[in-house]
Swiss-Prot record:
Residues 14-21 are annotated as: G1. The keyword Transferase does not apply. The modification N,N,N-trimethylglycine is found at G2. Residues 91-94 are annotated as: G3. This is Elongation factor 1-alpha. It comes from Mucor circinelloides f. lusitanicus. The gene is TEF-2. One of its GO terms (cellular component) is cytoplasm. The lineage of its organism: Eukaryota, Fungi, Fungi incertae sedis, Mucoromycota, Mucoromycotina. GTP binds at residues 14-21, 91-95, 153-156.
């Protein structure tokens, strides 16, 4: 069997008609988890519908349709393999949802693939002031993505033109550099997702393309195809090496056992014997046991939904939205206030200082006041537009200072991504999304249980 390949998540971004579905469909079709029977079924249907040419995008549309109808499609269909990695494609659907999903999304992608349509007029539409190309790239950077691959698609429609390719590379390098990416570390690949050029195999239609190269701290890498560029992603650092952060989903009282908090390990690990602290409750105690699906675990790892038994803590002391952390390793603390970059998605009026909507951040659901609008930012370049704006409205991006109305524990996105993204809810819809830049923490003496005091002395 050999050792299992490392898993990486990629998100595919780009303007609506850039050919994201076709390109993704092609990779999944050729290297992926779609079994032969499914493909034959699709091909037969395609032929009957006169789609004899069998578009890869159609595979993806079928998968999406089945997924939307609630037929739980084996998520393996969204996977494909490279020599080094098992790759999962995190779908980037319609624009509005995409921004929301990307920020509140549970899965964090390791790399973004930006697909750009090379056709005349198409590239210009995607990159124009209203196009989504810039905005998706800026969002990816704001959310902490540092690995990017740019695929210039539909090269067949440009008659495989080297000049057109170079023109696009120059333009895209310019705007991704403005955003903050280093173009030298970004592989650019000219492809045809439809015909398959430079997808898995080197194209014979573009003999002028000598290959992509990228320079990173780890050294420089080169290759010819999109698949090779994906295979050259820097291996992700999994969050099990970070200090523990476990936002509580619920707290149960179980007869004969005691208090059992439940939640998903976001970073770090949790094990029996650990002295943990709960923020903002400021309770410290010892973990007696950890279990998942009614089985005892030696340790809970990132992604695990665990229940753990704690000593001398009542159900009244801790609640959903509290964050459990290791008292000896960067313990979580209450947040007095925090600064965040927010993007206003849909708010009917103007938002000014004093606005106090509900924030959903990890499992916490707490009203927070926009206490100060610090600066307004251009969403497409990420540059500052004005200091201390009087108000912001739909479509704007701003840096704001926020003050929770009740004790809350959040973290900077760069330290603990799952605890540093939030959605702003008001009028029963998502009004804005944000990323936390910095947190002002409260030091307060809290309740230390006997069990914790004893365990600490060991």
């Amino acid at each position: 069997m050999g050792k299992e390949k490392t898993h990486v998540n990629v998100v595919v971004i780009g303007h609506v008609d850039s050919g994201k579905s076709t390109t993704t469909g092609h990779l999944i079709y050729k290297c992926g988890g779609i079994d032969k029977r499914t493909i034959e079924k699709f091909e037969k249907e395609a032929a009957e519908l006169g789609k004899g040419s069998f578009k890869y995008a159609w595979v993806l549309d079928k998968l999406k349709a089945e997924r939307e109808r609630g037929i739980t499609i084996d998520i393996a269909l969204w996977k494909f393999e490279t020599p080094k990695y098992n790759v999962t494609v995190i779908d980037a659907p319609g624009h509005r949802d995409f921004i929301k999903n990307m920020i509140t999304g549970t899965s964090q992608a390791d790399c973004a693939i930006l697909i750009i349509a090379g056709g005349t007029g198409e590239f210009e539409a995607g990159i124009s002031k209203d196009g989504q190309t810039r905005e998706h790239a800026l969002l990816a950077f704001t959310l902490g993505f540092r690995q990017l691959i740019v695929a210039i698609n539909k090269m067949d429609t440009t008659k495989w033109s080297q000049d057109r390719y170079n023109e696009i590379v120059k333009e895209v390098s310019g705007f991704i550099k403005k955003i903050g990416f280093n173009p030298k570390s970004v592989p650019f690949v000219p492809i045809s997702g439809w015909h398959g050029d430079n997808m898995l195999d080197e194209s014979t239609n573009m003999p002028w393309f000598k290959g992509w190269n990228k320079e990173t701290k780890a050294g420089s890498k080169t290759g010819k195809t999109l698949l090779e560029a994906i295979d050259a992603i820097e291996p992700p650092v999994r969050p099990s090496d970070k200090p523990l952060r476990l936002p509580l989903q619920d707290v149960y009282k179980i007869g004969g056992i005691g208090t059992v908090p439940v939640g998903r390990v976001e970073t770090g690990t949790i094990k029996a014997g650990m002295v943990v602290n709960f923020a903002p409750a400021a309770v410290t105690t010892e973990v007696k046991s950890v279990e998942m699906h009614h089985e005892t675990l030696t340790e809970g790892l990132p992604g695990d939904n665990v229940g753990f038994n704690v000593k001398n803590v009542s159900v009244k002391d801790i609640r959903r939205g509290n964050v459990c952390s290791d008292s000896k390793n960067d313990p979580a603390k209450e947040s007095a206030s925090f600064t965040a970059q927010v993007i206003i998605l849909n708010h009917p009026g103007q938002i000014s200082a004093g606005y106090a909507p509900v924030l959903d951040c990890h499992t916490a659901h707490i009203a927070c006041k926009f206490s100060e609008l610090i600066e307004k930012i251009d969403r497409r370049s990420g540059k500052k537009m004005e200091d201390s704006p009087k108000f912001v409205k739909s479509g704007d991006s701003a840096i704001v200072k926020m003050v929770p109305s009740k004790p809350m524990c959040v973290e900077a996105y760069t330290d603990y991504p799952p605890l540093g993204r939030f959605a702003v809810r008001d009028m029963r819809q998502t009004v804005a999304v944000g990323v936390i830049k910095a947190v002002e923490k409260v030091d307060k003496a809290g309740k230390v249980t006997k069990a914790a005091a004893k365990a600490s002395k060991k």
